[in-house]
A protein has these predicted regions:
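Conserved active-site alpha-helix within GNAT-family acetyltransferase domains
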Residues: 74-89, 203, 215, 227-244
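Conserved beta-hairpin
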Residues: 20-24, 74-88, 158-174
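A conserved beta-strand-loop-helix scaffold within acyl/acetyltransferase catalytic domains
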Residues: 139-195
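Acyl-donor-binding surface of acyltransferase catalytic domains
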Residues: 47-122, 223, 245-249
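Conserved acetyl-CoA-binding loop-helix of GNAT-fold acetyltransferases
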Residues: 49-58, 189-194, 198-211, 215, ...
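Conserved acetyl-CoA binding element of GNAT-fold acetyltransferases
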Residues: 34-45, 70, 183-194
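N-terminal charged segments
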Residues: 1-60, 74-75
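Helix-loop element at the rim of GNAT/NAT acetyltransferase active sites that forms part
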Residues: 62-64, 130-142
Length: 252
């Protein structure tokens, strides 16, 4: 699984709404089409060239820069080199992957809760409101929001946003991205309002998106999990493959 993930999702990822791909000899980066951000998602560096490549990425970044570091990325002291270049680490996440055929689907929704795909701009706005409340304002980059809006008019959709509702109140939100030409779909978001945590809402939201990926013919489902969600996902059948740390740098 890890070899397939590295090749399909990191070395040669597919572009999506609002996201461009730039493949070079030592790095692969994703770039926001509005130029406001870039991210190094794959690298193959050595002790001899790492500092030079890192410095070049920092220098070329017009907007915010993220270096998506995985625990198996060489050289072994790459975290120290990123820190020396002025980048700062975010909390460590766990790369989890599930074979969709092994998941127990469908996942039962909690009583009084329904999960639905977003079909209009109002739904996208609601998704953003939930994320802002759960993760803090500005947690979802504007280019990502625009990508979800753009996907509404595409067939098949490269991104599906999903909301969990309790009556007329949106209580959780997430999205699933379909990486056509690969074996992978990926999960993002998944934030649930504090008063609804521990009731199975997160599992239902994962299950809904897993069914969408299954119905589109994808083999694997991938997510970068925080400590709170990791045990839930592992209980559903996801397997840890690596640790990953976003290293961030913003221009002055």
């Amino acid at each position: 699984m890890l070899t397939a993930f590295d090749e399909q999702m990191r070395r040669h990822p597919v572009p999506g709404p609002g996201v461009l791909i730039e493949v070079e000899e030592r790095v692969t980066r994703t770039v926001g089409s509005d130029g406001s951000w870039s991210a190094v998602v794959w690298s193959d560096l050595t002790a001899a060239d790492a500092d030079e490549v890192i410095a070049a990425e920092v220098a070329r970044a017009v907007g915010s820069l993220e270096w998506k570091l995985y625990s198996h990325d060489p050289p072994g002291d790459l975290p120290d080199r990123l820190k020396a270049a002025g980048l700062q680490p975010e909390p460590v996440e766990t790369l989890l992957v599930a074979e969709i055929a092994d998941l127990d689907l469908p996942v039962r929704e909690p009583a009084g809760v329904r999960t639905v795909s977003v079909d209009d701009a109002a739904g996208v706005a609601t998704m953003l409101e939930v994320h802002d409340e759960v993760f803090g304002p500005g947690s979802v980059h504007s280019s990502v929001v625009e990508g979800v809006r753009t996907a509404l008019g595409l067939r098949p959709r490269p991104i599906e946003a999903v909301l969990a509702w309790a009556g007329d109140v949106a209580i959780s939100a997430g999205r699933v991205e379909f990486h056509e030409g690969t074996d992978f779909a990926s999960l993002w978001g998944g934030g649930t309002l504090p008063t609804w945590r521990g009731r199975g809402v997160f599992r239902a939201l994962v299950g809904h998106r897993a069914e969408l990926a299954r119905d589109r013919g994808f083999r694997y489902l991938q997510v970068d999990a925080m400590p709170a969600s990791r045990p839930i996902l592992e209980g559903m059948g996801f397997h840890p493959l690596a640790e990953t740390t976003p290293w961030l740098s913003s221009p002055l």
